[in-house]
Regions:
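Loop/turn elements at helix/coil->beta-strand transitions in domains of secreted/extracellular proteins
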Residues: 39-43, 74-77, 107-111
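Bacterial Sec-dependent N-terminal signal peptides
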Residues: 1-22
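Oxidative protein folding and maturation machinery
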Residues: 141-148
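Conserved redox-active cysteine motifs that mediate thiol-disulfide chemistry
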Residues: 47-63
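Non-catalytic, surface beta->alpha helical segment in thiol-disulfide oxidoreductase systems
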Residues: 98-138
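A short beta-strand-turn-helix
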Residues: 25-42, 72
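Short pre-active-site segment immediately N-terminal to redox-active cysteine/selenocysteine motifs
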Residues: 40-43, 47-51, 99
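Thiol-based oxidoreductase modules, predominantly thioredoxin-like and allied folds used
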Residues: 22-27, 65-87, 105
Length: 148
């Protein structure tokens, strides 16, 4: 009985912590675009590597926060691109990633809507993500405004 109770408590704790953080789907970029289109969301990409200290810091201190997780999980299909794996290498080349961590908010057609290089404090990261969703403050909108 003790073991069963401990297992249940452990499982509940794990689930509550997991639900609070950014939920990264194990999808290819193309699959993420398809899901984003179907769900009316943008694609959030965390370009990372297992050996990258600032990347791990962002994962542990920012992307694990409840407020960040709730916002990102509601607005985005979230995936990670490991620069040491084939798809990550291709992504890095296609989107001109020259440092990590780098974060992208992409439209369903692959257009960069918003981009962030480097680690940030949680409140700064969340403000960046909110600007990326906002039509008139996204990098995409501002670049188009300059071109007109």
């Amino acid at each position: 009985m003790k073991k069963s109770m401990l297992l249940v408590i452990s499982l509940l704790t794990y689930c509550s912590v997991f639900a609070q953080s950014v939920k990264f789907d194990t999808l290819s970029l193309d699959q993420a675009f398809e899901r984003a289109k179907a769900e009316g969301k943008f694609v959030f990409v965390d370009v990372t590597a297992s050996w990258c200290g600032p990347c791990q810091l962002m994962l542990e201190e920012v992307l694990s926060r409840k407020d960040v997780g709730e916002f990102c999980n509601k607005q985005f299909i979230c995936i990670q691109m490991d620069v040491d794996k084939l798809e990550g290498k291709d992504f890095k080349k296609k989107y001109g990633v020259n440092s990590i961590p780098t974060f992208f908010i992409l439209q369903e057609d692959g257009t960069v809507r918003h981009r962030l290089r480097g680690a940030r404090r949680p409140e700064d990261f969340l403000a960046w993500a909110k600007r990326g969703v906002n039509e008139t403050s996204s990098l995409f909108f501002l670049n188009n405004l300059l071109e007109e």
